[in-house]
Amino acid sequence: MKIMLVRDRNVLNNNWLAYFANLLHERGHEVVIACDTYGKLGVSAPGHELEPGVRLANVNGKTSSPLQNFWRRIRCKALPSWHLFDRLIKAEKPDVIICYFPVDLYNVTRFQHHNIPIVQMVHGYPPMILDKVLHKNPLSRAFCRQSFARINTWQVLMNSYKKEIDPFFAPQNVVRIANPVKQYAENEMVDLSAEKKRIIYVARIEKKTKRPHLLVEAFAKIAAEFPDWKVEIWGMRKYPEYEKEINDFIRAHNLTGQVALMGYTEDVEGLYRRADIHAFPSASEGFSLAIADAMSIGLPHVGFKDAHSVNEIIVDGHNGFLADNVDDFAAKLKILMKDKELRIKFGYNAHEDMKAYAPEILMNQWEELFQKLCPANPDTKK
């Protein structure tokens, strides 16, 4: 079966997209990643390169012609690309189109008349991804609605998200397929018996959703009791004013030697192995691979009870704790910091819980979906 994955830009630096495309390819599918970018293709991280059999089709990519590049640079910024995707779809003739974001759906539907089944992914809490469409002007909403009507299946990451798509989008078929999670044998798990006295948070350093400042505030309440413990926040740094707020708080509360913003790293697994606790104060997630991967390797977690997805992956009192507020977050951290055996217990439970998201299981669910969308295709694996 030929599958077209569509994401308009920042393709190569999306580790999950590369992983998913490679898994499809390993199962015998022909995979084409279609994008529309002149200067934002991205760079693959080591270990996350596309397999040689996965093809990349960039409708606005650079060429060897300076004149053509000048035109493509203008076209990419100023003009829609629907006709370019229409041409690509006619040439490739995919069996299924999978759209990463709503903008990708527009690119493969507007002023196009193909009847290829379309799967729309929702990589987050649906209202956060989709509700911005509801605030567009009436004409724009009408155009958007025409595109959304072309969707055969919506794919969400949590069961609770099935009911969170607004009726405006008229979702007819919504399935839950979570992200596949890397699996570790028991002898590959993090060694929590060797105490590192380190709490980590792996997420981009951003205020509205990821909220690392809440972890810093929580730790400040108990730091004096645990002078040997450290908090490290690892993730992409794009907001210097927000970082200044956090660093000012760190200095004001004499936490300079205990709390640090560490920035981006490609060795995330190494971070997990050097930690005792993964604290995750995010307000909302789709299906956080940062949580899932850390659980799979055996780390206990602390999150917030009102955080979408976080409050389903973290099971309170089983593989971690869920907190009501910052004070409670601090209290839950304190319990785990004082009790190594509890950390080991929660970490093992987390490791076991992630077996339900093994790549083989999740990719079988995708195969079942493809079978429903293209029942006559002999290449669809049952």
Give names to the regions the model predicted:
Residues 99-105, 122:
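Short His-centered aromatic/hydrophobic patch
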Residues 14-19, 197, 206-221, 231, ...:
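A conserved mid-protein helix/loop that constitutes part of the nucleotide-sugar donor-binding site
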Residues 86-87, 136-154:
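Membrane-proximal helix-turn-helix segments that form the acceptor-binding/catalytic region
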Residues 305, 315-327, 335-341, 355:
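Conserved acidic donor-binding segment of nucleotide-sugar-dependent glycosyltransferases
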Residues 264, 283:
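Aromatic "clamp/platform" in nucleotide-sugar-dependent glycosyltransferases that forms part
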Residues 106-109, 146-173, 181-183:
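A short, active-site helix/loop in glycosyltransferases that binds the activated sugar's phosphate group
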Residues 300-304:
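Short hydrophobic beta-strand element within catalytic cores of glycosyltransferases
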